[in-house]
């Protein structure tokens, strides 16, 4: 008799068990089409999403939105994703940041990681890969009770 092995599948969005509040995500990308796609995908998974088109707009939204996680493009005008990451670390220490890029290089990934990015993903990012990283970042940040992660 052979055993059937089934992969563990995440339940879906992370919800804080104490407040029953959905995780708030701040998504930053200067490509309006991709920003809309990311927003649709994340809202479909029941996350609260604030979408902005620049790092400067993200910094302005940071105090108002009080996100649990930031997802940002690497290459943007005025301030890039690494600059945004460093500014976030100053203003909101401990806030996790996932960096996305269409033109990722090994030096970019090393710089992002050394600067404190939680994850560095290349575009086009697979939906499940993005969702997995979002869930991991939220759990590492202590947003959810990790004992309730799997059914």
Describe each region flagged by the PLM.
Residues 53-57, 80-83:
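Acidic catalytic/metal-coordinating carboxylates
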Residues 35, 77, 105:
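The feature encodes the CheY-like receiver
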């Amino acid at each position: 008799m052979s055993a059937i092995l089934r992969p563990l599948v995440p339940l879906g969005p992370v919800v804080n068990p104490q407040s029953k509040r959905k995780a708030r995500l701040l998504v930053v990308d200067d490509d309006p089409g991709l920003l809309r796609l990311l927003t649709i995908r994340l809202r479909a998974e029941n996350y609260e999403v604030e979408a902005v088109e620049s790092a400067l707009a993200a910094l302005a939204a940071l105090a108002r939105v009080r996100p649990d996680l930031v997802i940002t493009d690497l290459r943007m005008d005025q301030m890039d994703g690494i600059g945004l990451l460093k500014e976030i670390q100053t203003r909101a220490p401990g806030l996790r940041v996932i960096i996305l890029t269409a033109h990722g290089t090994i030096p970019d990934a090393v710089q992002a990681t050394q600067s404190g990015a939680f994850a560095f993903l290349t575009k086009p990012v697979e939906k499940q890969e993005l969702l997995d990283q979002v869930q991991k970042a939220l759990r590492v940040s202590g947003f959810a009770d990790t004992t309730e992660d799997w059914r």
